[in-house]
Amino acid sequence: MGLEKSLILFPLFVLLLGWVQPSLGKESSAQKFERQHMDSSGSSNNSPTYCNQMMKSRSMTKESCKPVNTFVHEPLEDVQAICSQENVTCKNGNRNCYKSSSALHITDCHLKGNSKYPNCNYNTNQYQKHIIVACDGNPYVPVHLDATV
């Protein structure tokens, strides 16, 4: 009797695992935004190697060198609050973008012209600028950094 039950339950278990497994470990758009753009711990401290270190540690140089990226040095809650601020049109024409009401501390990383994968080298520049983020989901949170202004 126990073997019959196992033979019936095992295929169901395999079917269930095949259905659930694809969602396991998949990064959400909000998680990707946090990984690629949030560095609440502080600023780049004028370190010329900040972008090289951060781009590598945040997995943006694994298969190629991401050409441009911006890190935001503000609390996550403050950046999430932008989703309830001034609604603006996104670069792609969508209407789910929002502009920060104040300038934020950011670091721009630009790939140096002579840099080639796997040796990704970046210029590091600090600014205080407004950011524009695309928001989505429930809760409504940033999923894309659209621009800095």
Swiss-Prot record:
Residues annotated as signal peptide: 1-25
Spans annotated as Disordered: 30-49
Keywords: Disulfide bond, Endonuclease, Glycoprotein, Hydrolase, Lyase, Nuclease, Secreted, Signal
Disulfide bond entries: 51-109, 65-120, 83-135, 90-97
GO BP of this protein: defense response to Gram-positive bacterium
Tissue: Pancreas.
InterPro entries: RNaseA (IPR001427), RNaseA-like_dom_sf (IPR036816), RNaseA_AS (IPR023411), RNaseA_domain (IPR023412)
Glycosites: 87
GO MF annotation terms: lyase activity; nucleic acid binding; ribonuclease A activity
Residues at the active site: 37, 144
A GO cellular-component term linked to this record: extracellular region
Catalyzed reactions per annotation: an [RNA] containing cytidine + H2O = an [RNA]-3'-cytidine-3'-phosphate + a 5'-hydroxy-ribonucleotide-3'-[RNA]; an [RNA] containing uridine + H2O = an [RNA]-3'-uridine-3'-phosphate + a 5'-hydroxy-ribonucleotide-3'-[RNA]
Domain of life: Eukaryota
Known EC number: 4.6.1.18
Annotated Pfam families: RnaseA
SUPFAM superfamilies, A to Z: RNase A-like
Subcellular location as annotated: Secreted
Residues binding substrate, per UniProt: 32, 35, 66-70, 91
Residue stretches of biased makeup (Polar residues): 39-49
Annotated function: Endonuclease that catalyzes the cleavage of RNA on the 3' side of pyrimidine nucleotides. Acts on single-stranded and double-stranded RNA.
Family the entry assigns: Belongs to the pancreatic ribonuclease family.
Subunit-level organization: Monomer. Interacts with and forms tight 1:1 complexes with RNH1. Dimerization of two such complexes may occur. Interaction with RNH1 inhibits this protein.
Protein name stated in the entry: Ribonuclease pancreatic
Source organism per UniProt: Mus pahari
